[in-house]
Curated annotation (Swiss-Prot):
Pathway: Cofactor biosynthesis; riboflavin biosynthesis; riboflavin from 2-hydroxy-3-oxobutyl phosphate and 5-amino-6-(D-ribitylamino)uracil: step 1/2. The gene is ribH1. This is 6,7-dimethyl-8-ribityllumazine synthase 1. Belongs to the DMRL synthase family. One of its GO terms (biological process) is riboflavin biosynthetic process. Pfam families: DMRL_synthase. (2S)-2-hydroxy-3-oxobutyl phosphate binds at D92, T93, R134. It comes from Bradyrhizobium diazoefficiens (strain JCM 10833 / BCRC 13528 / IAM 13628 / NBRC 14792 / USDA 110). It catalyses: (2S)-2-hydroxy-3-oxobutyl phosphate + 5-amino-6-(D-ribitylamino)uracil = 6,7-dimethyl-8-(1-D-ribityl)lumazine + phosphate + 2 H2O + H(+). It comes from the Bacteria. InterPro entries: LS, LS/RS, LS/RS_sf. Signal peptide: none annotated. The active site is at H95 (proton donor).
Length: 163
């Protein structure tokens, strides 16, 4: 279901044939399947190919992004966009705050320093019910949102590179 508060972006710069990387934290398998399905559907609809790398948890996502982006570029097959997917559910300790803040900060640092179109789909929620509402494509579809964010940034990057 589309979020009525969010107007669709009008930039239709061609990005078909681009290559995306999805890095997912498989801490909650079933939730992750829903996030991944939403992201993959958006990439396919836009005509992108993609690779998926799985890491143990959200804190490992930024390092995996950096490693994969560097390796792909060195092999002459750079990634054009990156989508980070995972879920952090609040517990009784400060672990939630550390994981949420540090993974987001590191992803933003990567996106800015490398001019990397990146969509952050790491859910940070209080309950598993909140996570499911955000993960399901039939509800808030945050996996799809993260992919759309990365695609929007890729369109901007391509359009401005041609200007």
């Amino acid at each position: 279901m589309a979020d009525a508060r969010r107007a669709p972006l009008k930039d239709q710069t061609d990005i078909s044939g681009a290559r995306a990387l999805i890095v997912e934290a498989r801490f909650y398998d079933d939730l992750q399947d829903a996030l991944l399905d939403g992201a993959v559907a958006e990439l396919k609809a836009a005509g992108l190919t993609h690779d998926v790398i799985t890491v143990p948890g959200a804190l490992e996502i930024p390092a995996a992004v950096a490693i994969a982006v560097d390796a792909a570029a060195a092999n002459g097959k750079p990634y054009d966009a990156v989508i980070a997917l995972g879920c952090v559910i609040r517990g009784d300790t400060i672990h939630f705050e550390i994981v949420s803040q540090e993974s987001s900060r590191a992803l933003m640092d990567l996106a800015v320093s490398r001019k990397l179109p990146l969509g952050n789909g790491i859910l940070t929620v209080n309950t598993e019910a909140q996570a499911w509402a955000r993960a399901r494509a039939s509800e808030l579809n945050k996996g799809g949102d993260a992919a759309r964010a990365a695609l929007a940034m890729l369109r901007i990057k391509r359009r401005l590179a041609r200007a």
